[in-house]
């Protein structure tokens, strides 16, 4: 984070802080989208339509979130985070040849009366998505809203960047 200091008199110092990643140029965005398309083609080509629908659906709910993209083993992840650190994301897409999952970080804090969340992890759990129709379920929307509350509110407006991370 760059920090610019302006002296306004002898006794006081006023600091202006610029948020990192607040804008992404069109060239950077196109490059990041190309990297994402490469990962989709490598790991989950059969699920392209579902991944596109999920990104659109999540982007509506978290318009200023950073989409942090990285590969891990035989899948890739798109983490929706308040900053450029994927591990701080509250929601995520995990895609592989086996299928697509909607991941919830900090799942212990989420109310899940319909018992949709699968897995036994203390940190992350997921919902298997058979199709875009799963996203239309009221229970999924409620879980997503609860997970998104308080996240990604740091930037008042604008579109969050797509941030590809190098693979292993």
Spans of model-derived segments:
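Charge-dense, helix-prone N-terminal extensions
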Residues: 1-168
């Amino acid at each position: 984070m760059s920090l610019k200091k302006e002296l306004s008199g002898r006794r006081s110092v006023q600091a202006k802080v610029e948020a990192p990643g607040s804008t992404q140029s069109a060239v950077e965005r196109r490059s990041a989208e190309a990297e994402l398309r490469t990962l989709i083609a490598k790991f989950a080509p059969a699920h392209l339509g579902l991944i596109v629908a999920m990104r659109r659906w999540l982007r509506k709910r978290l318009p200023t979130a950073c989409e942090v993209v990285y590969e891990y083993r035989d899948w890739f992840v798109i983490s929706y985070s308040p900053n450029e650190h994927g591990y701080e994301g509250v929601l995520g897409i995990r895609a592989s040849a086996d299928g697509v999952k909607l991941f919830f970080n900090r799942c212990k804090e989420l109310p899940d009366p319909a018992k949709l969340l699968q897995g036994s992890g203390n940190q992350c759990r997921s919902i298997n998505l058979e199709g875009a129709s799963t996203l239309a379920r009221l229970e999924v929307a409620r879980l997503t809203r609860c997970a998104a509350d308080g996240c990604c509110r740091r930037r008042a407006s604008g579109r969050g960047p797509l941030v590809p991370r190098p693979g292993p």
